[in-house]
């Protein structure tokens, strides 16, 4: 990280940010072209969990190349100055690189979907999706090999 003064190295802070995130941006490479999507997410303490339709471009790309870069941010605030030169943004962000795996086991898929559900909608009861509905959903686990966190003009929330 270029600006070491912005780096957050406390792994507990990183875990809390991942445990609060409901949306993330997932970047991948389609041949020689970049491709980026916003996805709902959840954190099980080891993997970032993602879900989406069981077919489509992003899944085709990930089957060919499962490497991803993920970005999560929170507390984003634009700061306006008297001139354009004085404008900036304050934020806390997490960037991670890793490898996606497709969750195929129905039990694991249901568990992961409930992790995402509870993270995005706290307090809602577990949902038991029927097999037919489960077949229409892709669940992905991102195993990170690198994570970094940056806080610029903001303090990570407890």
What is the predicted function of each stretch?
Residues 1-19:
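Extreme N-terminal tail/first-helix region
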Residues 19, 61-68, 115-122:
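Short, intrinsically disordered, mixed-charge
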Residues 23, 36-38, 67, 91, ...:
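Broad gene-expression machinery/nucleic-acid interaction feature
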